[in-house]
Amino acid sequence: MLSRVRSMGLNGIRGYEVSVECYITNGLPGFEIVGLPDAAVKEARERVRAAVKNCGFRFPVSRITLNLAPAGTKKSGTLYDLPILLGILAASELVRLPKTECAFLGELSLEGKLRPVRGV
């Protein structure tokens, strides 16, 4: 299954649109984030995995590929935790995303609570 979640990135004090694309397929279980993520974005894998389980959902035992587009722009910080979580849940057909144009960003605690992010 495939899902897309709108988010925002920060370049100094300027924001730019980021599309979080999530593709879940059969195969060897794995969780990869591509699209020039920094260490904090790569660490989202563990925060999101814990948050999904602690919010009462089942984390998919599948191959998960997340693309942060535009792929040529470096992504940094923890603000992608929430859109990554929503992308996985939407691609797993566990939640429906709103049809309206909105962007999601926020850091997640391991228990699934939202935390503020710098610059927003």
Where are these regions (language model features)?
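Peripheral, non-AAA+ core regions of ATP-driven protein-machinery
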Residues: 1-120
